[in-house]
Amino acid sequence: MKITLKRSVIGRPQHQVDTVKALGLKKIGDSREVQDSPAIRGMVNSVKHLLEVEA
């Protein structure tokens, strides 16, 4: 599963900033290939408004 940070974390609640960081994303446009697991899905779901997800 490929995730890309599409929106900034500036002004977001700290738990969302921490989740994006835990997913390995730092800057807008950063992409990362992650394993599709329930834990990762939950993290992605909590910040889905900031990410673009490709199967």
From Swiss-Prot:
GO terms for molecular function: structural constituent of ribosome. GO terms for cellular component: cytosolic large ribosomal subunit. GO terms for biological process: translation. Keywords: Ribonucleoprotein, Ribosomal protein. It comes from the Bacteria. InterPro entries: Ribo_uL30_ferredoxin-like_sf, Ribosomal_uL30_bac-type, Ribosomal_uL30_ferredoxin-like. NCBIfam families: rpmD_bact (TIGR01308). Belongs to the universal ribosomal protein uL30 family. Part of the 50S ribosomal subunit. This is Large ribosomal subunit protein uL30. The gene is rpmD.
